[in-house]
Design a protein with these regions (language model features):
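Flexible, low-hydrophobicity surface segments
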Residues: 1-171, 196-199
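Cofactor-centric catalytic regions
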Residues: 1-33, 40, 49, 165, ...
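A conserved hydrophobic secondary-structure block that centers on an alpha-helix together
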Residues: 216, 221-226, 231-256
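A glycine-rich, basic-preceded beta-loop-alpha segment at the flavin cofactor/substrate interface
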Residues: 355-373, 521-528, 532
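Glycine-centered tight turns that cap/initiate beta-strands
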Residues: 76-79, 252, 318, 517
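A short glycine-threonine-serine/GTX helix/turn-capping micro-motif
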Residues: 356, 372-384, 537
Length: 661
């Protein structure tokens, strides 16, 4: 990524390059020995209470009454809460849900009430004693049906919800966001096409199924300050959203996020965490633990959005793509959360990694009475590409051009004009196509190993655009200890991807110290850790990494300025290598441990200069611009695109269905 490349050039070429080298993971020993703490491992003593949730058995219904009297009377029950206790709305982009339902349930599993008790068993018994009277409503179970004028409205009050400027809901419908792309003139381009294909594809909702279920523990002290421990990809977003909904200041809301046992997007934003906090507010002083069952994981927290996609594309006789028209109907579920933004991501990526002069795309996020949707690996790209790449194969066949060659003709090159009107940054996509085709000997055919089997080869391209807001920022700090070891503060989360190790490598390389001198301050704690937007969108190495490098360079600059003053030299003549400051002019050297906390003496015993070295850094992509809501055109829609090509050879047993890659 060009931004990381720029900062890397700022690192001294005399410093051993730790980037690209295999190093031991910082969290490896903890995890293989069982010493690492995940949310469910945390101990809170005998005062811990356990929470369970009363959930709707219906996909769509009005709530006529909730009777909690029997639950409250059960011995061992310490609190029962309902939506009447918490009237505020919550949502990342569109605030369309209450913490607990107040007047209507919108999916099977919608939370109605919460119980805190001295054991999980008693809490479960209390939940069963809560009596709810419903007025059943017709559910919306398909996004296409949800678009019909006679479909029931999942959110009749859509026009009253708070929404960010770049999300465009349509009150009076089930459309929570409509994103458009209008590049060129697709309507008039079809008559110029030598071949046209049209296809419809459907992708269902999918559960993430991380090994670790969702766990949250909340405690409210006597002053009203809230602490939340949880398996979270978004501790700062949780602090912001929950505090806002509950009407407390962010300084009174603290989120501590230990290691996460798999997230894949399901632990981003706010799902079940607000439930634990709401219940804890009714039993101040005592921690309340909510741990979801595997059954709850499947229908009460985020799932991947479903998609009904219509694709139409055409090319000229030489195989050059001329036009593309897409209609995406995303199954956003009962509440939008990330779904509305995924609609945008798919919209401004709707041509796939191909240059098409004429594109018309309408991407809709549609309310249904299905589970709430959120981010899952790829953020709308796998669903969209599943249909688009099959269409590319079909169009190549229709024009009698090899599928790999067809892709090489049309794939994005450096400088290509994208569907938003911006230019493609440097990309090696054409070379990727050639390399994967060569790797599987594309064009050759090998016979199957047995008569009942069939063998085939396939190729596909991909691209992905992060759909984060243009002002999603990162920050970091670097503190040098007395022995010159380094404590690195970051707000991004370690969810198994190796982030802490990568950040340590970048900090060590930028500062000029050995990798094993670096320790990352963990767990992430919003009270002490520097701000990080979220651990999503494959963004940490790029965004948080830039903040880390800037913090390390800031510390490095302080050290060199200090030594330059003491030695009466220019900082440009100094370097830090292997934990020592060296002068290329006088050939003097000095260990960092001798200066980074206590400084250096002035000549002739006239006092000291320097002091504790703490570097600060931040990063925000200031160059992302808005898009025209009617055309989707703009100067730069996203921070960067990731591109790639894949090829595979498979053998399928036609009798058993077994697939070998």
């Amino acid at each position: 990524v060009e931004e990381v490349m720029v900062t890397k050039e700022m690192i001294s070429d005399k410093t051993p390059d730790l980037i690209g080298q295999s190093v031991p993971r910082l969290d490896a020993r903890e995890k293989v020995t069982g010493a690492a703490h995940f949310a469910d491992d945390l101990q809170f003593g005998p005062g811990l209470l356990y929470a369970r949730i009363k959930r709707s058995p219906h996909p769509h219904a009005n709530i006529k009454s909730i009777d909690t009297s029997k639950a409250k009377a059960l011995p061992g029950v310490k609190a029962v809460v309902t939506g009447e206790d918490f009237p505020g709305f919550i949502g990342l982009y569109l605030s369309d849900r209450h913490i607990f339902c107040r007047d209507r349930v919108r999916y099977v599993g919608d939370p109605l009430a919460g119980v805190a008790a001295v054991s999980e068993e008693i809490a479960e018994q209390a939940v069963e004693l809560i009596e709810v009277e419903y007025e059943l409503l017709e559910p919306v179970l398909d996004p296409e049906y949800g678009l019909r004028s006679d479909a029931p409205l999942v959110h009749p009050n859509l026009g009253e919800y708070e929404v960010v400027p770049f999300i465009l809901p349509r009150p009076g419908t089930n459309i929570s966001n409509h994103f458009k792309i209008r590049k060129g003139d697709a309507d008039s381009a079809w008559e110029k096409c030598a071949a046209i294909v049209e296809r419809r594809y459907r992708v269902p909702q999918v559960q993430h199924v991380p090994i670790e279920p969702h766990v949250a523990v909340a405690q409210v002290d006597g002053t009203g300050k809230v602490t939340l421990w949880g398996s979270s990809q978004s501790p700062f977003a949780q602090r912001n959203l929950i505090a806002k909904t509950l009407g407390i200041s962010q300084s009174d809301m603290r989120v501590i996020a230990p290691y996460v046992g798999g997230g894949f997007g399901s632990k981003a934003g706010v799902s079940m965490e607000a439930l634990a906090v709401a219940i804890a507010m009714k039993v101040k002083g005592r921690p309340v633990k909510l741990r979801l069952t595997r059954e709850e994981e499947f229908f009460t927290v985020f799932v991947r959005q479903g998609l009904v996609g219509y694709f139409k594309m055409g090319c000229d006789e030489g195989g050059r793509l001329l036009a593309m028209e897409n209609k995406f109907y995303w199954d956003g579920g009962a509440y939008t959360e990330y779904g509305v933004n995924m609609t945008r991501a798919a919209g401004y990526s709707s041509s796939g990694p191909y240059e098409v002069p004429n594109v018309k795309t309408d991407s809709y996020c549609v309310y249904t009475n299905h589970p709430v949707t959120g981010p899952m690996r790829g953020f709308g790209m796998p669903e969209m590409h599943a249909g688009l790449e099959q269409c590319i194969d079909d169009l190549a066949e229709a024009i009698s051009i090899d599928p790999a060659e067809f892709r090489k003709i049309n794939c994005l090159k450096t400088g290509s004009i994208l569907v938003t009107g911006s230019q493609m940054h440097p990309t090696g996509l054409p070379q990727c196509v050639e390399e994967v085709a060569q790797a599987i000997e594309w064009g050759s055919k090998d016979p199957p190993s047995e008569p009942t089997k069939r063998r085939g080869k396939g190729i596909a391209l991909m691209w992905k655009a992060p759909a984060m807001p243009p002002n999603a920022g990162s920050s970091a700090w670097v503190e040098l200890n007395e022995d010159a070891t380094l404590t690195l503060g970051v707000g991004g989360q370690e969810i198994g991807q190796g982030t802490f190790t990568v950040m340590a490598q970048m900090a060590a390389a930028a500062l000029g110290v050995p990798y094993d001198w670096v320790r990352v301050a963990a767990p992430v704690d919003t009270q002490y850790s520097p701000y990080e937007w979220q651990t999503v969108a494959s963004r940490l190495t790029w965004s948080m990494g830039n903040a880390v490098v800037n913090a390390a360079l800031d510390a490095r600059g302080q050290v060199l300025d200090l030594v330059a003053e003491a030695w009466d030299e220019n900082p440009e003549d100094l370097d830090i290598v292997g934990g020592e400051v060296i002068s290329y002019k006088s050939e003097e050297s000095l260990s960092l441990k001798d200066i980074v906390v206590y400084g250096l003496p002035k000549p002739n015993d006239r006092g000291w200069i320097g002091g504790p070295i703490v570097g600060r850094g931040n990063f925000m992509p200031t160059y992302v611009t808005g898009l025209d809501p009617e055309t989707g055109q703009g100067e730069r829609a996203v921070v960067h695109y990731t591109t790639g090509a894949q090829a595979v050879e498979v053998e399928v047993d036609m009798e058993t269905g077994k697939v070998e890659v």
